[in-house]
Amino acid sequence: MAAKEVKFGDSARKKMLVGVNVLADAVKATLGPKGRNVVLDKSFGAPTITKDGVSVAKEIELKDKFENMGAQLVKDVASKANDAAGDGTTTATVLAQAIVNEGLKAVAAGMNPMDLKRGIDKATVAIVAQLKELAKPCADTKAIAQVGTISANSDESIGQIIAEAMEKVGKEGVITVEEGSGLENELSVVEGMQFDRGYLSPYFVNKPDTMAAELDSPLLLLVDKKISNIREMLPVLEAVAKAGRPLLIVAEDVEGEALATLVVNNMRGIVKVAAVKAPGFGDRRKAMLQDIAILTGGTVISEEVGLSLEGATLEHLGNAKRVVINKENTTIIDGAGVQADIEARVLQIRKQIEETTSDYDREKLQERLAKLAGGVAVIKVGAATEVEMKEKKARVEDALHATRAAVEEGVVPGGGVALVRALQAIEGLKGDNEEQNVGIALLRRAVESPLRQIVANAGDEPSVVVDKVKQGSGNYGFNAATGVYGDMIEMGILDPAKVTRSALQAAASIGGLMITTEAMVAEIVEDKPAMGGMPDMGGMGGMGGMM
């Protein structure tokens, strides 16, 4: 085991503070509408240019182990805020820096760190409660666009496209962000339920120009097993042929003789048919088949519930207005399911989302929910260069998280104003002793730091602006983009309450831990001596004796 170096008390905290300040100073340059860019070096290719706080934080690693610990702890603040609300990373970093700097001054003056932390925690709880009261619901498209614009560093086109996507797919819909191929941002919306399975044979294609199979007003046969024997399917195929409607088969797999027979029947025009594999695997496949059944008003043919393929009738089949199948995807449009059943299924999935602890499961459940309740929108980010594309995509993702958070918990006035207004919650707040009161006062000062930083980045005088904002009330604040004072909500400067709350909670949590640090342990880095050169191989022997 390598030898360790241990630092105690003040010398440990000083080292940690250096790391905190290095990381926070780099990150806070990006805050606000006039935030600056940070250039990140890459081991290969062009450097990345970003105004995204968490991207900057992730890149920073310091040489000194003790300073690096401080930097990594602040990085954790940014990550926690990002995990909770998907945005607010820079705000969280600025708050954490202010709490740690103020807190360590108090500790150096001889205060009890544990009581300081208790004071900070008390004040945080009160401010969070006040933020929830200040929040107003974010319902209309205009407010959603404004939130997206602010989060995307004042890029209106991004705010607009996100609001449009949310309007089209609803609050439950899935919105994904991809790299586009043009210069402009594009939005494409998939109506109905789409899953990532294409046709099992290209012979099912009936639209050669688009290489797609389109079925109008089809019946859907949903089977939870492999189909390899055509005899099992004959009764249901005959019934479908008599009904004169196309058929889509969704099964675990269709292979061999069964697939060949379907292809031949389709090509001869005896029965218009297409087959695809069921989406997902294992239990998730069963659940998704059930989703399709509920959406189309059909029944999954499964031996688990005592249904066999031989006994399937037209009553077991689902109905849809149209189905489009290409090489990669199948889209079911306007399923004929009963609305009450669909709503019950949506409620059931929502309950599962609340109960699951796995992020992966939550994401998959969210997708299933969107396919049943809303739709799927894809935002394709356009840019002139690869570097700009990456930077823009990160901002679009941030803005998307921010708008979701706004819909969830409402909005508060932006530009650091909400935190200043929430200070009234701790005006009369008293701790159990004087040191807790110092902790409360410390947070009171720290909470102003985001507003100060936004103003400083815009090139104005922070103290003057903070004083003027404090004299106002309600939504009154400072628009750093234009240098005008006024109603922040009317000027369209909004922050999601969840983002502001998560940023403060993450900063107070880790800031409190740093203040109460008494010792730090790190591995001693030994300078390895340079390797010597290769030994001389000596001259080659003479070649005497040759004529």
Curated annotation (Swiss-Prot):
GO molecular function per UniProt: ATP binding; ATP-dependent protein folding chaperone; isomerase activity; unfolded protein binding
Signal peptide (UniProt feature, chain positions): none
List of residues binding ATP: 30-33, 51, 87-91, 415, 479-481, 495
Reactions listed under catalytic activity: ATP + H2O + a folded polypeptide = ADP + phosphate + an unfolded polypeptide
Gene3D superfamilies, alphabetized: GroEL (3.50.7.10), GroEL-like equatorial domain (1.10.560.10), TCP-1-like chaperonin intermediate domain (3.30.260.10)
Subunit structure: Forms a cylinder of 14 subunits composed of two heptameric rings stacked back-to-back. Interacts with the co-chaperonin GroES.
Annotated protein name in UniProt: Chaperonin GroEL
Native species: Pseudomonas aeruginosa (strain ATCC 15692 / DSM 22644 / CIP 104116 / JCM 14847 / LMG 12228 / 1C / PRS 101 / PAO1)
